[in-house]
Amino acid sequence: MPVDVVAPGVLRACAGGTNSYVVRTDDGLLLVDAGLPAHWRLVGEAVRRLGAAPRDVTGLVLTHGHFDHVGFVARAAERLGLTPWVHEADAPLVGAPYSYDHAMPRTWYAVRHPRSLPLQVAMVRAGALAVEGLEIVRTFGGAGPLEDVPGHPVALPTPGHTDGHAAFHLPDRGLLFTGDALVTLDPYSARTGPRVVARAGTKDADRALESLTALPPGEATVLPGHGRPWAGRVEDAVAAARRAGVA
């Protein structure tokens, strides 16, 4: 389903194998990640399904600045007046979302993991080659609640995938948005289950594995940047990711 309910008051919009989330809070609707350009229409559908209107969207947080997570930031700024929040180390990347380092060349992965090709094609069809960045952002530097963001999500820096990657936690609701720090579908290998993203899309795989310690233990619904939600103890998902290693 392109749009589905993943937790009470939370809808996931999925296009090109990438997830964007719409979260109902007491302070308005919060968007977590801006996906690809195709997500714009799907997020609008999710807002309507929550019985809300575009004017009710009052916040946008980005787990990181890669092109497949900032796909509609420019449109959200223009049409909704939203300025996205992102870790300060990834702020330049939001403005230039294709200009990032990765540990291994992607062409090698396409040959070695042919099952990932349909995912890559789906990303292109969802607008992966036509993402417009945004230079005006709001930033945070460390861990802690974002008081000016609806729902006051707790930012959890999880560097490795990018220098400024961060997860977001809503502890009172048991929701953990992990972006690409912890996924259940690796878009470069097509492998499923809790894991970190392959070296084709990750700057520092060792650091990415190490930073999983920042994710709080306990029961939660883990909402990743790629793949299906995962429910259970966060430490079990982290252990599974470490066992899986990095493709």
Report residues per predicted region.
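Short glycine/proline- and charge-enriched loop/turn segments
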Residues: D101-P105, S189-R199, A241-A244
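Conserved beta-strand hairpin/beta-sheet module of binuclear metal-dependent hydrolase folds
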Residues: M1-L50, P54, F168-T184
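Divalent metal-coordination and catalytic microenvironments
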Residues: G9, V23, D33, V43, ...
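Short alpha-helical
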Residues: T18, A38, D68, P92, ...
